[in-house]
């Protein structure tokens, strides 16, 4: 099923005027987990507001260690994602809880599986685990994890997660992680199939999403950059139950709202089905106000605020 809506957009930037067909879409919001506006109170208040406004889900980012220097601004230094998600879960009842994205190969997958299963249980089945192989070599070096092995480690970690979440007893060897399971019990298990949304923009990441993912989660790509990736993803995963998500830098309090509306239309026209904007506000009040305005823009764009 697709929706049609009349819209006026910038012809010079490659968009026409008139009727366009859109895929059904939902919307989440990134929590103030990093930067000047971030705090425990900020995460709590933003999560509660997101639920009140009808957002489908709330999202947090992941870095364990970030180098100093101009290339890594203060906004790169963030609260631990699982703690932030748990904090948000404690104050909400409905919104999904997502990672955008967890750098999976830096972590012990058995530990991740246990944490996610516990959070999924305690939150009532709300976790969306966005994962990727990572890109910051210095971060891997600080953790003593071989950067060159991040691809195979990601693939094997996904296998471990799925096995831990579904098998009552596991006997298996996982050579990349040098992990050996002999009739291991790994309770609790999630309440349901935890969706794995695969992040990354390279062809190998798209192939991973097609082969083993439950969705794809991109970040900060323009509609033009996104289009070829959506085509490739839909060639392998044509079903509409496979979400194509995009994290954006939209700040509805600062940015031209007409431009945001036009970009929503353009993304939807090429097949994006979920949005995660991240306001750039430096104060909590500004962040919350940006969330309110963005929610109104999604409604104006006929984006469902949550998937019922």
Give residue spans per PLM region.
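Active-site mouth loops of central-metabolism enzymes
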Residues: 29-41, 100-110, 190-201, 247-258
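Active-site-adjacent beta->alpha loops and helix N-cap segments on the catalytic face
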Residues: 222-236, 283-292
């Amino acid at each position: 099923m697709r929706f049609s809506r009349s819209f006026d957009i910038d012809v010079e930037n490659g968009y026409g005027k008139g009727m366009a067909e859109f895929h059904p879409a939902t919307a989440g919001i990134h929590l103030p987990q990093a930067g000047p506006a971030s705090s425990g109170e900020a995460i709590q208040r933003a999560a509660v507001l997101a639920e009140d406004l009808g957002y489908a889900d709330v999202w947090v980012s992941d870095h364990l260690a970030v180098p100093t220097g101009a290339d890594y601004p203060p906004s790169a230094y963030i609260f631990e994602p699982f703690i932030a998600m748990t904090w948000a879960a404690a104050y909400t009842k409905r919104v999904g809880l997502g990672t955008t994205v967890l750098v999976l190969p830096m972590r012990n997958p058995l530990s991740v599986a246990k944490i996610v299963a516990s959070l999924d249980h305690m939150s009532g089945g709300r976790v969306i685990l966005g994962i990727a192989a990572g890109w910051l070599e210095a971060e891997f070096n600080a953790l003593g994890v071989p950067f060159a092995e991040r691809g195979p480690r990601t693939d094997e970690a996904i296998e471990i997660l799925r096995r831990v979440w579904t098998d009552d007893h596991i006997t298996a060897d996982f050579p990349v992680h040098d992990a050996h399971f002999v009739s291991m019990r790994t309770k609790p298990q999630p309440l349901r199939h935890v969706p794995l949304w695969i992040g990354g923009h390279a062809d190998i990441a798209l192939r991973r999403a097609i082969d083993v993912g439950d969705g794809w989660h991109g970040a900060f790509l323009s509609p033009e950059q996104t289009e070829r990736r959506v085509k490739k993803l839909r060639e392998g995963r044509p079903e509409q139950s496979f979400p194509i998500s995009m994290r954006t830098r939209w700040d509805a309090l600062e940015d031209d709202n007409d431009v945001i509306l036009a970009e929503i239309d353009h993304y939807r026209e090429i097949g994006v089905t979920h949005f995660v904007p991240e306001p750039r506000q430096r104060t909590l009040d500004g962040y919350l106000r940006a969330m309110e305005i963005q929610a109104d823009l999604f409604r104006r764009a006929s984006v469902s605020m949550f998937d019922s």
